[in-house]
A protein has these predicted regions:
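HhH-family (HhH-GPD) DNA N-glycosylase catalytic core used in base-excision repair
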Residues: 1-199
């Protein structure tokens, strides 16, 4: 059997083997992945993984309540942290998104209830994706992106959201010969669907 081709470093390999595509049903981990995907806009994912520990420290290990309460002094502290990504609009967006995240929790009981509701609480396997062909965005990610933006989220475009859906296991985009593809399918409630307005 062969794994997916994109993990090119040991750190990337660990992320592929133990995180990417594994269904997340915990709000804090959903928030962490969404923040990391938002930070990644325009950057490489490997850079984000390399800075992940610094990012975690800057954002109180993605404590949603803590991040939602951040003020100017917290932003300045993050901006001055050595090794941290220093693009202020993204930092401000994470703080903004924490507050929006909490509003969703209040409305739906949890963010997981909200986002998994878009897939009827199933992990999607799209036609042709197990052959190694998957898009940067699709109809599902566009719909979720639009809804999140209407709820006040920032830096959550369709491409970012598609990556989030892959990472958090709402879509299983591992190749069919990758052991992770089969492992996830054994434990997840899956549904096979035709492609959805892909780009």
């Amino acid at each position: 059997m062969t794994i997916c081709e994109w993990p090119t470093t040991p750190l990337y390999q660990d992320y592929h083997d133990y995180e990417w595509g594994r269904p997340i049903h915990d709000d804090q981990h959903q928030f962490e992945h969404l923040c990391l995907e938002s930070l990644q806009c325009g950057l490489s994912w490997l850079m984000i993984l390399n800075k992940r520990n610094i990012i975690r420290e800057c954002f109180d290990h993605f404590d949603i309540d803590a991040v939602a309460a951040y003020g100017e002094s917290d932003i300045e502290h993050i901006m001055q942290t050595e090794g941290m990504l220093k693009y202020r609009p993204k930092i401000e967006a994470i703080i903004n998104n924490a507050a929006a995240f909490k509003r969703i929790q209040s409305e739906f009981g949890s963010f997981c209830n909200y986002i998994w509701g878009f897939t009827n609480h199933k992990t999607i396997i799209y036609e042709n994706h197990p052959e190694g062909h998957f898009p940067t965005k699709n109809g599902l990610s566009t719909r979720i992106s639009k809804d999140l933006k209407q709820r006040g989220f920032k830096f959550v475009g369709p491409v970012t959201i598609y990556s989030h859906l892959q990472a958090s296991g709402l879509i299983n985009d591992h190749g069919k010969d990758c052991p992770c593809f089969k492992e996830i399918n054994k434990t997840a409630d899956i549904v096979r669907l035709p492609v959805d307005d892909e780009a």
